[in-house]
Amino acid sequence: MKSEIAPKDKVFNTAARLFYQHGYRAIGVDTIAAESGIGKMTLYRHYPSKDDLIVAYLKAHNEIFWNNFEQITKSAPTPRGKLLAFFEALENYVKTPACHGCPFINVATEYPENDHPGHQVALEHKQSVRARFRQLAREAGARNSRALADQLFLLMDGAYMAARMFGTKNPASHLASAAKTLIDAQTSE
């Protein structure tokens, strides 16, 4: 017996795929409804506006990001190792065709208005990533944990942008080694 996907999930999964591959502004509700096979009335019953759908997607992606972060870093025995493990995994991901950049950067670029709901979710996510990097940098014994966290943050976002711009031929093959250089410079004696 085949299990049926709920209409709300069909809409969400379709929107998530389209937003990530093509952008938020480029994809309209008509396209999402047509691609999901769900009527617009049903779509609007679950997501009263496109912004609601964008926010739901970003919140779900935030949860995925942190679950992945924990999975990637849990076996690293030290804070330094956790940072390195994250950047090694990120390097592997941004070199794949599945990577279309960072959905949080993408939404902030397409909706630069600070009061846009998607922009707000993106800002919250990025602030929490910076805070986690800062915590790990401090625990790793960085001389200036704020500077190291910000450098790593910029490196991460640069890798996402390079993936979006260059696809699989991006300069990310040096991402993990660049992170290691920054970490070593702040934590070596």
Where are each of the predicted segments found?
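Basic, helix-initiating cap at the start of DNA-binding domains
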Residues: 1-22, 26-38, 52
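Short hydrophobic/aromatic patch on the recognition helix
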Residues: 37-47
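A secondary-structure capping/hinge motif
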Residues: 51-53, 107
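Alpha-helical DNA-contacting segments of helix-turn-helix folds
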Residues: 54-61
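Hydrophobic alpha-helical connector segments
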Residues: 56, 70-96, 139, 145, ...
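Short, solvent-exposed amphipathic helices
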Residues: 71, 117-128, 132-135
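Amphipathic alpha-helical segments used for helix-helix packing
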Residues: 96-117
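Hydrophobic/aromatic-rich alpha-helical bundle segments in the mid-to-C-terminal region
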Residues: 119-124, 139-189
